[in-house]
Amino acid sequence: STPLYSSAASDVYKRQVIDYKSGVKKFKLSDILDGLNLQMFVYLFALCDDKNAALNGVPAGVLYMHAARNILNFNSPIEAKNNLENKKESRFKMNGIVLSDNDNAIAKAMEHELEGKYIPVSASVKGVKGDLITLEQLGLLHKKINSLVKKMGNELQNGVIERAPIKNSTHLNTCDYCDYSDICANTKAIYNKIGANLKDEQVIESLHKEFENDAGMDNTTE
């Protein structure tokens, strides 16, 4: 967790969780609807919800960074000379979501010039764009993740552990990495094909509909 930023008018810190990955991680907000990629968000909301903890604060997003050392390939010495620095920098670009706030202060605290070199947010004459999320939208994610974790816990307690590996555009070979594949004896004909590959705005719209009658945002507002 990183204490990113504290406004002059408040002692409330904005908190992010950054996951350093040995492999390439492609984050999709729509995965949350299917109960995937919850881990870093669970950490984030747990930190921010604990009012007695030194690390509490307002959630400011989740980012994934490829931390492995890559070999840079070039077709010629001239190409290497012209593109070496850009390729070096591109290795450290993170993906995920960043909290959108007034004047984009949080994004600027991470990358001052907002060129989109290191975070999935960039600025131009037309404004700031990228993988941004509002505090209210993070509140909807909080509600959804709480609901999913509660459902998972109840199912485990009741012995519901079905053989239903997932399969979508980012999870093609789930069984290849499963420690229980030998005893499961799955023929790979049994797959829980999930994910409509929704755009971020469609995910938020879906969450609004799901929780439109709920009051409050699970303490994710300042």
Task: Give the location of each predicted region.
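Single conserved hydrophobic/aromatic residue that forms the stacking wall/gate
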Residues: 1-9, 13
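Short, conserved glycine- and acidic-residue-centered signature motifs
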Residues: 5, 36-39
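Short helix/strand-bridging catalytic loops that position acidic/His residues to coordinate divalent metals
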Residues: 23-35
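Metal-dependent nuclease catalytic regions and adjoining charged, substrate-binding loops involved
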Residues: 48-180, 185-188, 192-194, 198-222
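Active-site ExK catalytic segment of metal-dependent nucleases
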Residues: 7, 15-24
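Cation-handling catalytic/transport regions enriched in His/Asp/Glu
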Residues: 22, 44, 54
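Short amphipathic alpha-helical face segments that pack within enzyme cores
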Residues: 38-46
